[in-house]
Structure formats: C-alpha cells, structure tokens
Regions:
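Residues within helix-turn-helix
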Residues: 51, 62, 98-101, 111-112, ...
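Short, Lys/Arg-enriched anionic-surface-contact patches
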Residues: 23-33, 38, 74-83
C-alpha cells in the first residue's frame, strides 16, 4: 500500500510541469522526459531497453539519453530500473504472487534472472525483501 502511494506521488511529480522563476518550463527535455516516464509505466513489463523508448520518440538512443539526463539528472536505464523495482516491490508485497509469478509478470526470462536483477538493485533477494517488509 505504501509503495502504491509512492508510485502515485512519483508519477504526479513527473507529469506536473516544473515551476521556474520565469513561469512554467515546458522545455523539449521535459516533454521527452514526461513521455518517457509514461512509456515506462505502460511498457516496462514488455521492454526495458533504452533503444525501445528512444524509437518511440523518434530520436537516436544517444540523443534520447542526453535529453533524459539533462531533464532528470538520471540516465534512462536508471529510471527504467527504478520503476521496475517499484513495480516488483508492489507485486511482492501484495501477497498475491510468488517470486516466479512476479518474474513472469515483469517479463523476465526466468525467476533466477529476476532474482539477480532485484538483488543487484536493492541489495536483497525478493524472498529477503518479503520477509523483512
């Protein structure tokens, strides 16, 4: 429940334009960032490659990465990983799914690969995370 609320807060902050001294900032970078974050929300279970998201915005991967980094201070892959980890935590804490089912829902080839991804991102295995939460 806490994570679901967190995802809503993050999404709300992302979608709202940035207030600057000269008014609202609707720069190209922010526009690309908002579309990217919406796409990550909609497609991260299917594709987690930066190239996929760059193609959706009709720009090269290199240019896309520069735009996202300038707008957010983060690399696109970091944003994708953070979202996938939040999604995974939410699914694990729901109690409705096993680790294997969460791996399948998130589009991982197998639960071992998902476990490695989760541990590298959080420092804990999915099982350890569920026991501690």
């Amino acid at each position: 429940l806490l994570l679901k609320g967190h995802k809503r807060v993050v999404a709300k902050e992302i979608v709202n334009p940035v207030e600057t001294e000269s008014g609202l900032d609707y720069s190209r970078e922010k526009e690309v960032l908002v579309r990217f974050q919406n796409d990550v929300h909609n497609f991260s279970r299917k594709d987690r490659t930066v190239g996929f998201y760059a193609r959706r915005q009709c720009v090269s991967e290199k240019h896309f990465s520069r735009l996202i980094k300038k707008a957010s201070g983060q690399k696109p892959l970091e944003i994708i990983r953070e979202y996938v980890v939040l999604d995974a935590k939410s699914l694990l804490l729901s109690g409705k799914y096993s680790v294997k089912q969460v791996a399948e829902l998130l589009g991982f080839q197998n639960h071992s690969f998902f476990t490695r991804f989760f541990r590298n991102s959080t420092g804990k295995t999915p099982g350890e995370f569920m026991r501690e939460e």
